[in-house]
């Protein structure tokens, strides 16, 4: 290291008078010292102040520019050297060298800029201001088709430089996308897929860019799907496959790309992985099984890709996914149930699946997870059942198959996601099914649990669904017994609160249920309706100009129904409802105006 100090002193003199031979010798000594101990040598270079002199050795005329760029690339491997390189004014001359025709100069310059940009805001900013990215992209475009090893090495360095330049920086990534880097990288991948280093660089770049929403459209207009699937089929190493997965997952969020991936044969690859890995207990295989099956489910989120794979219920992919549900592997059970939930996004698919025995498979799966079961599997299976119950024709079939009994086993669950799906499934099943609604509405355990969940302030979804199911039990059963059960369990106050919801659909469901209560069991419910301040709430809803027409209409229907109760009648009189109602006679909505006239007559007669 002593002769390093001599070299640095000598270099200071020769850098100024540019004595070529001794200059080359000094630079060779520096490179040698860096190869032996990079950190220590870099510290000495920084302390010597020589960095400032390097700018003058990076001119296009300089014969040693490649060596100087190489030295900068080596010192910039150290984090502490990156800002000093920027401060020494090296970025602008380095970017100028990107216009060189000499391959070695381009290689070392690309390395130097890439290392200076690595994890360095200052480095990136300086390269951005000097316009370095556009020149590199132009090089990638023009050199793209040349496949000799030296050129591939240069392409790899340039890709790496762009990656370091834009990594985790949305605005610089967006800049590269606007410069058209995506089609160029996809082309590179296609031509150089035999070159492992370059392929890897392209994949990492895709992984970075694919997270940006603006990139998806550009990716969709290339043949990225085809190239990635082709590459995937060739890979046997877990790490390489994992790398491709990391690009596929964000890309597959785009519906157009989902379809392209399906058409390129990705699904067949994924099914093969599942088959190979399902019985393995190796950590890598378990990870790959999860990633593969998750990606499969993601592909089914696109309507076109999902229908293509369903193939009218005859598709081999659909059949394979069905076979996952009875498997003993939790990950496959989960993916299978989620896939069914995705296939069940239109009525025709739902009807076909119910007719072909899917409900029994899902109920068997739920049965295996009742005691200390897997929450994600429970949630997925319930999601599938909920979706399957949407078509009217399926409801009676699912009820007679015993779905309500299977679902009710999860009433004791303390997991909000499971509670939420359980409630949604029951609500779908009883829609317009009077007998089922009555049976469930008289189930004291269920109603008490619903009332408890109506107070789940930490879980708005569960709270909302519980309220909606309470209301649905009354609306679809129109049963006095159901109303009595709900009154006895303390459910009335929740229905009254629901009438003030910010969601019109929920307000309306509450008002219709309350009108049925008032018509069928007013005597039983009047105390609860009074203490829940229903009359005051109705006055507020009618007086509020923002209330939707159907809310005003149903509020007036309810007011008329409440007149049969002495205490509620008195409250109506005390609140001067006539003023509010008479104003609504001129409402632009005909139904509201008519109901206002009827309500006004009723109030006048009863006063």
From Swiss-Prot:
Matching SUPFAM superfamilies: ARM repeat (SSF48371)
Region of interest: Interacts with polybasic regions in GTPases: 239-255
PROSITE patterns, per the entry: ARM_REPEAT
Site (Breakpoint for translocation to form the NUP98-RAP1GDS1 fusion protein): 1-2
Record keywords, A-Z: Acetylation, Chromosomal rearrangement, Cytoplasm, Endoplasmic reticulum, Guanine-nucleotide releasing factor, Intellectual disability, Mitochondrion, Nucleus, Repeat
ARM repeats: 89-131, 170-211, 347-390, 391-431, 479-519
Single GO molecular function: guanyl-nucleotide exchange factor activity
Residues carrying N6-acetyllysine: 230
Region listing for Critical for catalytic activity, in residue ranges: 379-428
Pfam families (alphabetical): Arm (PF00514)
Residue span of region Prevents binding to prenylated RHOA: 122-170
Single GO cellular component term: mitochondrion
Motif (Nuclear export signal (NES)): 4-13
PTM notes: Forms covalent cross-links mediated by transglutaminase TGM2, between a glutamine and the epsilon-amino group of a lysine residue, forming homopolymers and heteropolymers.
Subcellular location, record wording: Cytoplasm, Cytosol; Endoplasmic reticulum; Mitochondrion; Nucleus
UniProt record, GO biological process: angiotensin-activated signaling pathway involved in heart process; CAAX-box protein maturation; cardiac muscle hypertrophy; myosin filament assembly; negative regulation of endoplasmic reticulum calcium ion concentration; positive regulation of mitochondrial calcium ion concentration; protein localization to nucleus; regulation of ERK5 cascade
Linked pathology: Alfadhel syndrome: An autosomal recessive neurodevelopmental disorder characterized by global developmental delay and regression, intellectual disability, hypotonia, delayed motor development, stereotypy, behavioral abnormalities, and dysmorphic features.
Function: Acts as a GEF (guanine nucleotide exchange factor) for the Rho family of small GTP-binding proteins (G proteins) that stimulates the dissociation of GDP to enable subsequent binding of GTP. Additionally, appears to chaperone the processing and/or trafficking of small GTPases containing a C-terminal polybasic region independently of GEF activity. Targets include RAP1A/RAP1B, RHOA, RHOB, RHOC, RAC1 and KRAS. Regulates mitochondrial dynamics by controlling RHOT function to promote mitochondrial fission during high calcium conditions.
Subunit composition and interactions: Interacts with RABL3. Interacts with RHOT1.
Designated name of the protein: Rap1 GTPase-GDP dissociation stimulator 1
Organism, as annotated: Homo sapiens (Human)
Gene name tied to this protein: RAP1GDS1
């Amino acid at each position: 290291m002593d002769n390093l100090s001599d070299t640095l002193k000598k270099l200071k003199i020769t850098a100024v008078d540019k004595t070529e031979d001794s200059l080359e010798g000094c630079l060779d000594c520096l490179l040698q010292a860096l190869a032996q101990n990079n950190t220590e040598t870099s510290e000495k270079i920084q302390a010597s102040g020589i960095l400032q002199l390097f700018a003058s050795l990076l001119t296009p005329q300089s014969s040693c520019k490649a060596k100087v760029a190489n030295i900068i690339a080596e010192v910039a491997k150290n984090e502490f050297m990156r800002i000093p390189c920027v401060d020494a004014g090296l970025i602008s001359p380095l970017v100028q060298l990107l216009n060189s025709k000499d391959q070695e100069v381009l290689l070392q310059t690309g390395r130097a800029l890439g290392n200076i940009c690595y994890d360095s805001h200052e480095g990136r900013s300086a390269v951005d201001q000097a316009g370095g990215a556009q020149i590199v992209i132009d090089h990638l475009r023009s050199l793209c088709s040349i496949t000799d090893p030296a050129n591939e090495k240069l392409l790899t360095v340039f890709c790496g430089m762009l990656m370091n330049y834009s990594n985790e920086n949305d605005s610089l990534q967006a800049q590269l996308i606007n410069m058209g880097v995506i089609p160029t990288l996809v082309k590179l991948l296609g031509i150089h897929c035999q070159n492992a280093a370059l392929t890897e660089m392209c994949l990492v770049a895709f992984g970075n860019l694919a997270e940006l929403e603006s990139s998806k459209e550009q990716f969709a207009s290339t043949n990225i799907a085809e190239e990635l699937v082709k590459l995937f089929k060739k890979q046997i190493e877990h790490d390489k496959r994992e790398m491709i997965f990391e690009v596929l997952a964000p890309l597959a969020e785009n519906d157009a790309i989902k379809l392209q991936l399906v058409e390129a044969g990705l699904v067949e690859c994924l099914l093969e992985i599942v088959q190979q890995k399902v019985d393995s207990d190796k950590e890598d295989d378990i990870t790959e099984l999860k990633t593969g099956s998750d990606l499969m489910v993601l592909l089914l989120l696109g309507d076109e890709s999902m229908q293509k794979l369903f193939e009218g219920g005859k598709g081999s992919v659909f059949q394979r996914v069905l076979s996952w549900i009875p498997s003993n592997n939790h990950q496959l059970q989960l993916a299978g149930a989620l896939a069914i939930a995705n296939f069940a996004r239109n009525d025709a698919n739902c009807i076909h699946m119910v007719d072909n025995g899917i409900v029994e498979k899902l109920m068997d799966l739920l049965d295996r997870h009742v005691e200390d079961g897997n929450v994600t599997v429970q949630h997925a299976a319930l999601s599938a059942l909920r979706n399957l119950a949407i078509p009217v024709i399926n409801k009676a079939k699912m009820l007679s198959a015993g779905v309500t009994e299977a679902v009710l086993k999860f009433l004791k669950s303390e997991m909000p996601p499971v509670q939420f799906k359980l409630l949604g499934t029951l609500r779908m099943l009883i829609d317009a099914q009077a007998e089922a609604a009555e049976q469930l509405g008289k189930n004291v355990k269920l109603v008490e649990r619903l009332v408890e969940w109506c107070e789940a302030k930490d879980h708005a979804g569960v709270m909302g669904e519980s309220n909606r199911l309470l209301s649905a039990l009354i609306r679809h059963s129109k049963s006095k017994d159901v109303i009595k059960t709900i009154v006895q369990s303390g459910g009335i106050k929740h229905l009254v609160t629901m009438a003030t919801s910010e969601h019109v659909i929920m307000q309306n469901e509450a008002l219709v249920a309350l009108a049925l209560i008032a018509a069928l069991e007013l005597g039983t419910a009047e105390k609860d309706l009074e203490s829940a301040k229903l009359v005051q709430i109705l006055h507020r809803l009618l007086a509020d100009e923002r209330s939707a027409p159907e809310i005003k209409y149903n509020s007036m229907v309810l007011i008329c129904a409440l007149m049969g109760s002495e205490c509620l009648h008195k409250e109506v009189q005390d609140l001067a409802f006539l003023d509010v109602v008479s104003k609504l006679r001129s409402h632009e909505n005909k139904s509201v105006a008519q109901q206002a006239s009827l309500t006004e007559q009723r109030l006048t007669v009863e006063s």
